[in-house]
Structures are given as C-alpha cells and as structure tokens.
UniProtKB/Swiss-Prot annotation:
Protein name: Enzymatic polyprotein
Organism of derivation: Cauliflower mosaic virus (strain CM-1841)
GO biological process: proteolysis
Residues covered by region (Protease): 40-130
Chain ranges of the Reverse transcriptase domain: 272-452
PANTHER family hit by this protein: POL PROTEIN, RIBONUCLEASE H
Amino acid sequence: MDHLLLKTQTQIEQVMNVTNPNSIYIKGRLYFKGYKKIELHCFVDTGASLCIASKFVIPEEHWVNAERPIMVKIADGSSITISKVCKDIDLIIAGEIFKIPTVYQQESGIDFIIGNNFCQLYEPFIQFTDRVIFTKNKSYPVHITKLTRAVRVGIEGFLESMKKRSKTQQPEPVNISTNKIENPLEEIAILSEGRRLSEEKLFITQQRMQKIEELLEKVCSENPLDPNKTKQWMKASIKLSDPSKAIKVKPMKYSPMDREEFDKQIKELLDLKVIKPSKSPHMAPAFLVNNEAEKRRGKKRMVVNYKAMNKATIGDAYNLPNKDELLTLIRGKKIFSSFDCKSGFWQVLLDQESRPLTAFTCPQGHYEWNVVPFGLKQAPSIFQRHMDEAFRVFRKFCCVYVDDILVFSNNEEDHLLHVAMILQKCNQHGIILSKKKAQLFKKKINFLGLEIDEGTHKPQGHILEHINKFPDTLEDKKQLQRFLGILTYASDYIPKLAQIRKPLQAKLKENVPWKWTKEDTLYMQKVKKNLQGFPPLHHPLPEEKLIIETDASDDYWGGMLKAIKINEGTNTELICRYASGSFKAAERNYHSNDKETLAVINTIKKFSIYLTPVHFLIRTDNTHFKSFVNLNYKGDSKLGRNIRWQAWLSHYSFDVEHIKGTDNHFADFLSREFNKVNS
C-alpha cells in the first residue's frame, strides 16, 4: 500500500470553514456520455499531492478500484484509505482540454481539487492577480480567470439531475466562500501594495522578480556537470571514418610559464570531472591562447588542436540556425532576456567509445575528455540538436543559437511567463546556465554579436574595437583574412563592402606572393577611418512596406533594403540592410542593362527572408528594368539568360519604380562613400 502526505479532508474542511482569503478557485467542466455538461468550481492546491474529486460529480460507472489503495495521512495525524480512482479524465478549463491520468475519490468538502501532480504536468504553474496560467502541451500558455466566489454542486442527487432528459431538479449549490476570495503574492504574483497593475503599466519590481530569481538559481552553476542540477540527458557519439587508424600529432614545446598555467587548468578540469587520464592511441597537442578576450578575463584559454582528428572523423550535418531567420523572429518585440549555457559543450556526455578520440597531450601527460570538448567539428551541431529538441516548442518567444538563449515578448507580463517557462524547461532537462551572463527584462540587449534596441540593431562595440586595433601594416595573408572576416561579419552595415574589400581581397590569391606596400598601409588607414561607427539599422515590422534600391557599375553591384514606417500619418523610409558583391568574370561582359537586372536579383536573394511572400517595391534608375519584367522572351533561344531571370523574378510580388539618376541618392551615397576610401 502506498503512503502519501496529502492535504485532505480535515485540513481542507478547516480551510473552507475559515474561508481562507488566499484560496485559488477556477472554473472547470466535465463531460460524460448521457449527462449534461457538469460545471465545477475547482480548488487549485499546490500542497496536495494528488487530484481529488467528489463521488457526487463523476458518475459511478467511471470509478474503478485502485490497483493499489493509497494510505493518506491527514492533518490530525490519523490515516484514511483511498481505494477508488477515475482514469484518463478530461477536464476542460478555459476552453482547453487538460487530460488527468488519475483522479482519486475522496470527500473533502470541495467538488474537485487540482493537485500538484496536475501543476507539474502542465508546468510552469504561475499565478497572477486575476488569473492562473498552465502550459498546454508544454508549448503555449492558457490564461484562466480566478473566481472571486466559489460553490459546491457535488451533493446527493446532483448526478441524477444532470442526466439527459432527467426531470429531477438540481440541488441548490452550497456556497463555500462566505467572503470574497483574494489572491496572494504566491508563485509569480503581479500585485504591489494592494494595487492592481494593468499589462501596459506593469513594472518589474524586486518583489515580482523574486520567483524568477529562484528559478534562475535552480539552473545556474559554475560547474557544467553540477551533480545537484544536471540530468545528463545530452549524449553524443563520434566515429572515425577509418577505425583502424590512430590519429597522432606530435607534442608541442612549452615555456615554464605555460607549464605552470597548464598545472592549474588540468587540475581544474580533473576536479570538474570533464577529463580523465588516458591510454588512448590517439594524440592531439594542447596549447594556450591569450587573445583580447583572455586578457580581459585575466586567464589564458587551453585549446586542443583537433585539426587532424576532425579530418579523420565523420561530421554531423545538423544545421545551425540562420542568423537572419532568428532576427526575423524578434521583429516588433519590446522586452528581452538572454541566457548563456555554462560551458555548453561540456554538458554533453560522450559515450565510452568516443572518449579516446578526444585524447590530448600537455606537460602534465595524456588525457581524454568525458564530455564534448571545444574544437571538435561536430560540437556545435551536436549541441544545437539537443537545444532545439528542448526549446523548439517555444519558438514563438524563444530562439537558440548553439549555447545562447534569447527570450522575447511584447510586454512585461507575457515576458514574466515566457522566462519562467524557459527556466522551467532548463530545470526539467538539467541544462545549466551561467548566472553572471544572464540578462533579464531588458529593452536593449546583446545577442549574436548585435546590440538590439527599440526596433534597431547594430554590431556590438567590440566589433569596431577589433577593426580599429588591427595594425595598419599587416604581416601575412592570415592576418589579412582575419581583418576581412570582421568586415564580412558587419557586411549588413557597410554599403558597397565588396568594392572596399576588392583591393585587399586580391592579395589573398594563391598565385600572388605576399607583399605589403606603403600604398596598402594608406588604403588600410582610410578603410579604418571610414568605419568609425555603424549606424543602427531598422528592424522591419511585418506590416511595414518594404523597398529595395539597387545600383550596378562595371565590376560591382549594391543593394539596400528599406521599410516605410508610418508615424502619425507621416511616412519615413528607414534603412534596414545593405548588400554588395562583385560581378563574376563572365558577368563583367554583360550589357549594363543586364548588370542592373542582376543587381536586382542578387539583392532580392540577399534579402529573400524579408521579401517572401510580401509585396514590395523595386526602385532603380535603370529605365530598361521596368520594361524587362513585362517583355515576352519566349521562343528566343539567344536570350535564355533573360528568360531564366524572368522566371525567377515571377516567384516574387513587386512593383517597379523608376527614378532619375540625379534622384538616385542611394547610388550617389555609395559612390561618395567608396570615393572616401579610394581617394
């Protein structure tokens, strides 16, 4: 016989007789074949372990004997036995069906008690001043209005009166709340000094944040394998393409200072149980890096060179999210929170067969990882797959890029719920977060290297710092590649970047020996001088009309995405994105009209995530393009390229607006900015 500690008859009757002003009642509805709908006032009791119903609200034929009767201790210390249960009952709340696996029969003075097992099944359970919220199918919240008065209908003769075609009069309901029920500051209540706050006027105070802080505390730790918090549900396996080969890379030489640093870091990793001594036939060298990020935190970072192992293992093709797609999810959102997984990859356990493949050498010996280490090519895809599995159902208000989690909402009240749901999911799966990196309830937030603020976005300040700190004289092709990589990262914010890059890009060709001249230094200085800041770009809302403006020259094309923002009857065109590129060798031989058409096509491709499936405007100073769209090229085999372009453009819905060259401020702007660099 099972034993449970449960608020039952004596305690609940005591509560009801005193008329506890903090009681939570909600409307529920039951349907049974042959009966009219049964409407109940359900008591939500998170202190009760089980769901309990009166025998007078569920027909006798639906009750069965429990496989194992339950012995329940009640408030006065005595025990009672519950032997009747109702299986798989549907309780309709706020128009939604909530399935309850088991309801126990017990007379408590209340028709239906919703216990903690229900609250956990549809967690997170959150209480506001005028409502409670359960989460349906772990994906969307159901808002349920609280009752200010409650009655009991389940008394002798009630079920007989509820039978269809019954002529028995329904017994008079019994009032079980003689006073108006008030709501406590319990769970995450939104009540301040007796003052009810509307959704529009909600301010997050320390008191209202208390429960969020408690949830955050449950999932945060400095140990990514914290035994009190991890569920170890993330697992991974790595396979060699040729299992018969041993992958060995010769050890490195280390300075006395590096040896001392390795001593500290290896001990830390052993204490965390993320590595262990190894007898693996495989070997990769570990080394220390001390870049800007490491200097800021005052600690070198240990890195393992897995280049050879990555070539020898089978990859993982699971895609990482497209950053532009993630940004479209947050359009129009006003409040944000972000979370960082603590040493995310280390939360993924490797199976026993995979661990020897991660073996590395350092001054202290030969070790292998128990978890997925940084540097393995499969690591980002492995981790993203697990995170998508956990958070995919919350896509309407949450996006995840590897180990970065962003929660976004329209208002503070929604956000309170959304954050609670995400933290509850982390707790459920044992996903451990970094508390010091958590950003809560922000209107301005950093995500994916961007600063997102009031409908605009721009690269974070450190991107510009990296550009400015680059030396004017570069030493080799690798250094130049790093500089161009930073420019590419910020390409959405730099008009005609392709033209700016071209002279530098030419120095990376395989058949061109490395040489850095005074002219190159001057050019580098001018590039940096003209990139002293990135303008915040507008994040277009779904209802705003979009415009693309394009331009083409002999060797390059450029494009710009704009949105028309209507504010108090005034239309304002706001810049959303830039795009640019170089024409291929064959394309440079095209007629100027074809280059202008190709500029339009390339720009649409770049911004397709915004331009599908909306109707937009194409603005160009090329007179040919407007007629090109409507020309009939069918049957002319010499113009196959034009036919293909027309077919491709037909998948989009747009109007074309021709502007005079003298009015094409976009082209003038591009030329002016480019001339600044080349002058």
